[in-house]
Amino acid sequence: MSAQGDCEFLVKRARELVPQDPYAAKAWLITARTLYPTDFNIQYEMYSIERNAERTSSAGRLLYDIFVNFPDQPVVWREISAITAALRNDSQDKHAQFLKGVFETLPGQVQCKMLLKATEQCFNTLEKAEMLLLLLKRFPESVVQHGVSLGESLLEAESVEDLETPVNCFRKLFVCDVLPLILNNPEMCLPVSLLYKYLHKAAEFYICYVTREPSADGQMQGSQEVGGLNSPGRGRGQRSVIDGLSDKASVVTEPWDRLLEMVGVVGSLCDWQGEKGSRSYAELLQRVSDLCRFLSAADADGFSRCCSQIVSCCTLVLFHCAFHYVSAVQPSLFQGHSSLSSGPWVLLEDLSSVYADVEVERKHTHKKRKLADGREKTMSSDDEDVLAKGRGRHIVVSKSEMLNWAETLDHFRTARESWDLLHSHPSLEAEFAKICSAWKTEMWLWFRIFLTDMIIYQGQYRKALSSLALMSSLQLQQNQNQNQNSLQTGSSSSLENHRAVIQQASCHYALGEYRLACEKLLEAVGGLLPQNQEFVKSSDEQRKPRSKTRRGNDLRLVPCTSKSILPFCLQLMLACFKLRAFTDNRDDLALGHVIVLLQFDWPQGESLFLKAVDKICQQGSFQYENFFNYVTNIDMLEEFAYLRTTEGGRVQLELLPNQGMLIKHHTVTRGITKGVKEDFRLAMERQVSRCGENLLMVLHRFCINEKIILIQSLP
């Protein structure tokens, strides 16, 4: 019998004995190994018996022998692949735990060599990276040799794949696994330029990760495979899962904290001025703000270093605070927020002073004197407060409706300060522009929302309108991308669309473009549903006197709901018509619109209504044929009834449709026909019976039915 035949016989005999007498089987194999020490099959059979019996120590020793003596055998690499696969995942499977134990019994040098060899056997970039990560984590000394090359290979793979987003498997492994090993290794000595490159890559990943759009089902979905890696392309379309990674491997905990910690490490390595380890983003901004004061006095080298430090820190603070602000005012943009539970908020001009007016000399004694003297004027609800003073502007917000109002406005303020700092010097602005270009921030809808609100806050309304146009374009693109998204309901999409339209109306008003403002707000009103009558009552009851009147350049942050937006639209329309109604030129149509709109939030507009009555008395007549369609306020009805009397001045009122034609054909001594007078009395009686109607429904109908005439009434 040949030597090969002898070996096969001995192995076969040992296999037959394993079930009945494993010790006899081992004896046969020990004998065989002594006779044929270079035969692979004999030694592999010995290892297989120990592995199948899950005897960790002996299996480890035998694996060591066959790895050293037969490194090129394919079956050896299949075994090593199974072991490294067990090492790469957190499976609690019994066999996987055994394989990990076998690996742990190997000498460190052999472990290192085995992992390096296993890496060479990998042709998939992800698997190769994961294998090298095992090596780097177990043998930190290898980071110096392999860390940067691994990081660069991941970034190169990302570039070659031409992926749409930084939130991909290659960047995630680089930022969350490889980069911390590189930065925290004291033996590494990287150029400052490379440190900044890596910091910016990490920042882009973390920012894009936290600002991801909602997933299709709002839950983490993905492969249930044991391994941490999938082949790229799997799971595509599952937005919560990073393409190429399992669901568990896709999760990044506390991304903002991780980024802040990384900033501290990079700052220390770059020898930043005043770097003591960042405890918060606000503290980070404070340090670079102090540094900016010395920027002009620095030499060329110092200027360059300071510039890079300031831009990097301010950029991160800007996006951190802008994200938290936008996540409060439009949470449905991001994962982890349900658009069904919280809608958007919108930053608008504060119109609480729309009812204010200068005192005028009264020539008419009013029937309802109590309207002028018996009630104290009110401005806004007592649950509101002011924060964020800057450039002479205030932002008013209801604390009862936005529980985290102080934090939200503080984030808005800090983000604005960061933006201003980044644009305080041409060099800073140029470096920041490079980062924005590389990150394609012009495509970030959430950041455009912040920029728009900031521009509105700055009072640059023409620029704000351009920004709103860009925002609408991005919103349309996002809606098209999410047309299969079950969470993106028509209601939510409509509210977000209203947000932009209402801000456009507010900006046009601030620019004095009242007709354009009216067009936009009427567009928004068409999609709103007025609240029930109870809302009107409770709103009135909650209003209490305020000691001082706010200035006209304040802003108000309000929820983008019918309950809040319809009142704003009515106030804005009133503001648009108010100046036209009370000019020296007679404009009964504008004055009539004002009277209709003054019914809302009554009696806030009492003084303005009384001024309108004074003007009517001075004119001696008033024509508004929509009066009985939309005026249901009892105080107003009594005042107009009084105007017809001798005591009220016998004012000629043309409030019925076609009343003017009747008067021309049937004039009597007092300038009014008896038939018209009777019609007026009956109409007034019918109107009194309507005083209990839902006022918001009446005013909403006014906006819808009279849309064309309202727009045409403005220049």
Swiss-Prot record:
Q: Region (Disordered): which ranges?
A: 220-241
Q: What does the UniProt keyword field contain?
A: Nucleus
* Locations listed in the record: Nucleus
One matching Pfam family? INT10
Instruction: Provide one Gene Ontology cellular component.
Output: INTAC complex
Key word tRNA processing present in the record? Answer: no
Biological process according to GO: RNA polymerase II transcription initiation surveillance; snRNA processing
Task: State the source organism's domain of life.
Answer: Eukaryota
In terms of InterPro entries, this protein maps to: Int_cplx_su10
The similarity comment for this entry is:
Belongs to the Integrator subunit 10 family.
Q: Which PANTHER family match?
A: INTEGRATOR COMPLEX SUBUNIT 10 (PTHR16055:SF2)
Q: Subunit composition?
A: Component of the Integrator complex, composed of core subunits INTS1, INTS2, INTS3, INTS4, INTS5, INTS6, INTS7, INTS8, INTS9/RC74, INTS10, INTS11/CPSF3L, INTS12, INTS13, INTS14 and INTS15. The core complex associates with protein phosphatase 2A subunits PPP2CA and PPP2R1A, to form the Integrator-PP2A (INTAC) complex. INTS10 is part of the tail subcomplex, composed of INTS10, INTS13, INTS14 and INTS15.
- Functional note: Component of the integrator complex, a multiprotein complex that terminates RNA polymerase II (Pol II) transcription in the promoter-proximal region of genes.
Under what name is this protein listed? Integrator complex subunit 10
Q: Which organism is it from?
A: Danio rerio
- Gene that this sequence comes from: ints10
